[in-house]
């Protein structure tokens, strides 16, 4: 073993891609279940949603105006007799009479015989007549035909689609009050360390506030999960194991701190004592090298909890989540495409990378071109969350000493 307790002296640490493949290979997506639309925002549809009727279910007016027969307007006389009033939601009581126009509102069904709607602004009244001032009349003008949006039985939202507000509106309009969708993964965050105090407490000598729980629960929610943080677990084996055991009820457990190789880094041994299988410990990455990943034993028909031990330093924890935990959450939530998506950016200026590990360096995007242009931030390292928080994401520089030129393309890890 190397002096820090890891076997990396004999066995090379996994690369980022190797470690990510190990993570994703252990993910079992949650089984779909029924959700009411009010609870389905952001979920992934598990079955195609079908139209239960034609949409629109009738020929309808697209504007306020007059429903008429276009053939009545082909001759020189542009006057039509005023017929019945048709507001939205009304049903015509009869078809159009000879040279008659019905007063119609947007969304109302057309009376039988009407094949055009003339905008109110292109007409004027003359006693019991309406005079059509529109010079060019074509059949179908200002009309949405029955079934133009969809026919009964058509797929209106495909499975695998994220349920956005607009798609939820589509489902509601086609009579789908409940949908089969992959439920949100449940995430628990357990912060560890005697040096931590909660944000509403004043740190004592040698203490810092717990920023990780707030950041990581927010990241998990942003990735589509339900997330909660437990209280800070102390650096005492029994208390730590009790906190970790509570977290194993979730789909994914995130533990911060205690994963390196110091005498007080008790998390790996505590997790393994609870039956969590270690898949890897430490990755060739900067920041975030001490990351630990394992899988708990299955409970009944429920897959084992995915467990990530992230470094205590905030930016290492942030990078570890974005690189490894977020793709796992996307897979759990039924978003396989997100998990494997890659981005890149063009360097705004020259950049020098030094080090034997790939480095994730915070950067802002300065253009919206394709690929976008990125400028690395002035950054003090893995404890400097303040400046990293201003980033749009992280530029992923390869291991080794290299001077990059302005304009070079570099992999980019988006923050959101």
Per-segment meaning from a language model:
Residues 153, 237, 348:
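Phosphate-binding chemistry for phosphorylated carbohydrates and sugar-nucleotides
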Residues 20-24, 64, 120-121, 154-157, ...:
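Predominant activation on well-ordered alpha-helical scaffold segments within soluble catalytic domains
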Residues 1-75, 80, 336-360:
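Short, low-complexity N-terminal leaders and the immediately following helix N-cap/first helix
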Residues 2-14, 22, 66-231, 374, ...:
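Short, glycine/charged-enriched hinge/interface segments at domain edges or termini
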Residues 33-38, 47, 60, 89, ...:
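Flexible glycine/proline-rich
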Residues 1-4, 8-16, 177-310, 314-320:
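Helix-rich terminal scaffold detector
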Residues 12-20, 33, 37, 59, ...:
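Generic structural signal for well-ordered, non-membrane alpha-helical segments
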